[in-house]
């Protein structure tokens, strides 16, 4: 079972809900409603989800302003429409098949890679990161320890999805066009291009994650979420100095998985 969170009150944590509202808006009820809509495609707003994906690249702050609007109108920070998750899953499947093609994998090897990437890299790691950030934000970043000031687990998961999408596009789509003819050529230009794409992708993940938690008015010191930029830049510099090609390591790992 996913960790549950206490109910946030009205906008910015002020006020209190009556018992009937609280029962209707428990974490379990929200989760059930979300999962139920996961199989009702006609009820999903794919146009709005696609709009969010676009703005995650051009203006991610606008995406989180919509989360504020949802809190005002539906009394929850997390998405109640799984359309974004569905589109992200489609992107992940298509790009992973592309990876299998670029790495010259057979049909069954590509299917095996797809299962690994979807259920372990995306779902498994995503649940782990979301739970970790949910715990850290509630334990250390909340301004006032109260049941009225609580980061929803669903919101932590949404922040991860928001940050994961640009990383996915950069590393699993854009990078595909450079792997065989540039990145894996065992030259300085090769690992410069590849590692720079990794720097941009992971850096964007950190930045979008920071924006997600800094958008919550009851959190403090969210700037600490930008601190991973320092070791990231150091690692990038060391990789260029040592000739360590991140993409080559990823491709070798993918091939090892499907043996």
Curated annotation (Swiss-Prot):
GO molecular function: RNA binding
GO biological process: protein localization to cell surface
Main subcellular location: nucleus
One annotated Gene Ontology cellular component of this protein: nuclear inner membrane
Lumenal face of the membrane: 104-115, 185-187, 244-259
Entry-annotated residues carrying N-acetylmethionine: 1
Induction: By mechanical tensile force in periodontal ligament fibroblasts.
Name of the protein this chain belongs to: Protein unc-50 homolog
Organism (species): Rattus norvegicus (Rat)
Taxonomic path: Eukaryota, Metazoa, Chordata, Craniata, Vertebrata
